[in-house]
Amino acid sequence: MNKAVSDLSSHTPMMQQYWRLKNQHPDQLMFYRMGDFYEIFYEDAKKAAKLLDITLTARGQSAGQAIPMCGIPYHAAEGYLAKLVKLGESVVICEQVGDPATSKGPVERQVVRIITPGTVSDEALLDERRDNLIAAVLGDERLFGLAVLDITSGNFTVLEIKGWENLLAELERVNPVELLIPDDWPKDLPAEKRRGVRRRAPWDFERDSALKSLCQQFSTQDLKGFGCETLTLAIGAAGCLLAYAKETQRTALPHLRSLRHERLDDTVVLDGASRRNLELDTNLAGGRDNTLQSVVDRCQTAMGSRLLTRWLNRPLRDLTVLLARQTSITCLLDRYRFENLQPQLKEIGDIERILARIGLRNARPRDLARLRDALGALPELQVAMTDLEAPHLQRLATTTSTYPELAALLEKAIIDNPPAVIRDGGVLKTGYDSELDELQSLSENAGQFLIDLEAREKARTGLANLKVGYNRIHGYFIELPSKQAESAPADYIRRQTLKGAERFITPELKEFEDKALSAKSRALAREKMLYEALLEDLISQLPPLQDTAGALAELDVLSNLAERALNLDLNCPTFVSEPCMRISQGRHPVVEQVLTTPFVANDLSLDDNTRMLVITGPNMGGKSTYMRQTALIVLLAHIGSFVPAASCELSLVDRIFTRIGSSDDLAGGRSTFMVEMSETANILHNATERSLVLMDEVGRGTSTFDGLSLAWAAAERLAQLRAYTLFATHYFELTVLPEAEPLVANVHLNATEHNERIVFLHHVLPGPASQSYGLAVAQLAGVPSEVIVRAREHLSRLEDTALPHEAPKPAAKGKPAAPQQSDMFASLPHPVLDELAKLDLDDVTPRRALEMLYALKNRI
């Protein structure tokens, strides 16, 4: 980025003005308005030209040096801004605020807005179905304060967290596009590995000033009403966020009305690895196809989709809330009531973000048109909601108000299909304001006046080729061919000479020009003033409007979950106080949708008698699917949704852990095995008897003995913790665990071979698997047949020559014992053993036997 320039004396007046503004924002790109373009200069220009793939050129000189520059048309800036924001850049918008006609020297310019990835609110720059969050964090390993703001909705939350692991897990859940941290934090902390990290001055996080600014924002004396007055660190982080939002928006933020105190104890905690492995809203490739959200989200509004995503990423342990949601879904399913609500909800649209843009005073005409349509649809929707007897739905209906006065105001003000922006006018209806109507009439009737004037002048002068016209540079004119110009009347005043023509003006035309041109500019100014006043009227009603938007978003989610329950054959889970997890005919909600054949449903039963299932079976047999479907069923239950199972009975869980699949962490310098062990360590340190743990192929990233030993010890530890555990493995030796751990049971995914090909049956059956079918899976994967044949030969030789052994028994506590290696990996017999096997001891003399013994000893 540009370095600050302190000596401005050698620069031109224009560049002096530029540097005075640029020096205040050295680390951000500056769009500097010059006429119809945003110009970008110096290092900003070099960077922007590369990022936007536009031409880098030069503009004159300043301080004796050519000025690198590039530019974009101001009316096309939105697309370029969107690209820069997606690349993580922040852009300072510097507009002309002075009048070029009256300015002496450079036109006055000001920074009117700073667009950053986390504070952008323009519809074109946002993903409509995902939250756009900015976060701030303060504190240290002992305790962190975290604040999260969605400026596009007004949602503002705070919480305090102990330890880096919990903080990083929460940041993974929130996934902010910008993260503000104190400038005095040490470098290379774990949080700095995230995208969009911005260091801010330590005083931005100061608790007392933060408390004061937050109370001013919410018009309260203190924060006791929000339940967060004791959260010193979180308040400091929230104050920094509020200051950053005001700095970037350069306006009041009336849509930020409250703080919500979140608590980890209220939620089912998922760490970052578990979120990725379960593919809640992003698949492992970074896309959105074949995720849980892609299956369960058929919301009618974008704000409903965003709320559902928040629910999926923050499952709850509050039984009161969960039961209220279940009852609501049951009510909406009764007589298919959701079918009547969903088309009406679609008419509401994304009023949550529209209201935020109104609060930021950058709402566009089409935003107001959509709000008008939404308010017009509210009365009918409210009537439909009165029939919903579930208590929670009744509360939502009470919160959903109608706004007949605002609806009438917008209906009177905004034309049916307004332009995208107010810049050129044409937004307000005729009849909304009499003064505006008069000015517009004068401007719009100019064409008829010119036609009439041309006809009169032709008749008066007898010059048939006379024309009356207008251009932006010279204004109105009367044009005559050069040959007829000498016949022009005396009151024709020469204005412009062209090749083959002369242009004139008359006192009458000049008088009309003054009125018409003045009327057009005054009409535009009047319309913009009326539009701003309309926004102020709407801002005064923001609190109830935002409450209505929140209620309708939740109604949309609940209606959506009712529709999904019907069409995906989901059933209501039952929460019980007895520790258990019993699922009958459970299905994987995502896999089921992509299969062309019927999904094989399976049961699961974990309780005080069985806390762990050791799952064996062939690759591709369905072990990972079975494990993941269990986690997704439990998660869906903890958002209040129905679940893909014939029945489900469970107690509340506190965490869901998954250790399924790994890859190298190249950026962090960690191997696949190191990633696997880090995830395993996290589980072993934090799992409780109320946690659900999925462990898939632990130990496969190292040698057989090491991997088996680690897997064995980890399984023992989880059994002792009494966590609900599904432990999938290819180490057949682990199937003896139930002999030492009474809470452990074996199950397997069955398969069979037919004509040397494997057939996966996908049924979960009691007991361990009989074999692994590895070669059959390799054949199915397309491994060349000659390789398969050779592998069978090796396998046969290994099985024939391996030393026989029994399945190992669990080591006694305190006595280290390496588990025996499985036959597949057994070492080849020593050649000495081959020699001994060939000996006919009955034909060997004692002397010959002694000689052979010495010879064999020398070969060992």
UniProtKB/Swiss-Prot annotation:
Keyword Protease (UniProt): no
SMART domains: MUTSac (SM00534), MUTSd (SM00533)
Higher taxonomy: Bacteria, Pseudomonadati, Pseudomonadota, Gammaproteobacteria, Pseudomonadales
A GO molecular function held by the record: damaged DNA binding
GO CC annotation terms, alphabetical: cytosol
InterPro entries attached to this UniProt entry: DNA_mismatch_repair_MutS, DNA_mismatch_repair_MutS-lik_N, DNA_mismatch_repair_MutS/MSH, DNA_mismatch_repair_MutS_C, DNA_mismatch_repair_MutS_clamp, DNA_mismatch_repair_MutS_core, DNA_mismatch_repair_MutS_N, DNA_mismatch_repair_MutS_sf
Protein name, entry field: DNA mismatch repair protein MutS
Residues that, per the record, bind ATP: 617-624
CDD domains noted in UniProt: ABC_MutS1
Compositional bias segments (type: Low complexity): 809-819
PROSITE patterns named in the record: DNA_MISMATCH_REPAIR_2 (PS00486)
Keywords, ordered alphabetically: ATP-binding, DNA damage, DNA repair, DNA-binding, Nucleotide-binding
Family: Belongs to the DNA mismatch repair MutS family.
UniProt GO BP: mismatch repair
Protein task: This protein is involved in the repair of mismatches in DNA. It is possible that it carries out the mismatch recognition step. This protein has a weak ATPase activity.
Region listing for Disordered, in residue ranges: 800-823
